[in-house]
Amino acid sequence: MYKITEGYLPFLSGRTYYRIVEPQKGTDTAKAPIILLHGGPGSTHNYFEVLDCFADDGRAVISYDQIGCGKSYLDGQPQLWTLDTWMRELKALIRHLGLTKFHLLGQSWGGMLELAYLIDEGAQGVCSAVLSSTLSSSQLWGREQHRMIRYLPEEEQQAIAEAEASGNYQDRRYLQANDHYMELHCMGKVSADAPECLRRKKVTGDEAYRTAWGPNEYTPLGTLRNFDYTDRLGEIHVPCLIISGTDDLCTPLVAKTMYDRIPDAHWELFEGCRHMCFVDDHAKYCTVVEKWLREND
């Protein structure tokens, strides 16, 4: 069994929950820990518990609920939901835990935060980075989602177009179309035999998501709508592994845009996987990432 330590970091007017999975006694614990940055914004750390197995390799696994969701829930303060807030939180967590050397793994929005840390903060303390189903440009992401929407049935395309034109994202037809799109490219319904962390009820940060991103994955309208680090990716000088799935919201074009511009980057494209490659092909994901971490400790 793993040793799991939970704690809270005072942050702004709330507090940030974190969870540390430590290697079993008797294993080599000299390896750099890995910090996991969840998506959303507002999706919680829960799904990352399927990656507790990284501790089997002798390294601590650190995850946290970003302010605004999960055990760090906070709402009614829309002015907080900016890249700057979550960047300050990440740096505060690193200081609080006394980390000087670590790996980063960011999924979806978490990878956007990771890119900003690598570039704006000079990748301080980072041994390597895993960019999992993420993006360097919100506008490119939006264009790619709209390209994939064209493969939906005509009536679903129409429902989405009408919602975007009217701003009414509560229409039943739109909601059904959006659910279908997300099932195709993000994640399907959670089955009764899925890992407990995926079945567990979570407190999502709806206000954080809507304010920072928008009403859905393909309409970036919030504070992150102009997020674009594409032209600065060449400033990254730590080893980077890009992971995406063939059926992912992170399309091959989105992933290749990063791969082409980050010096000496590696890219693993997972066949048949959607936005959560670590769920759709858990065994391969863990094998690929653990090998990467060992090579870059």
Please annotate each region the language model reported.
Residues C127-N168:
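Flexible "cap/lid" loop of the alpha/beta hydrolase fold
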Residues T223, T230-C273:
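Conserved loop-alpha-helix segment in the C-terminal half of the alpha/beta-hydrolase fold
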Residues T100-E144:
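Conserved hydrolase catalytic core segment
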Residues Q158-V238:
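Alpha/beta-hydrolase
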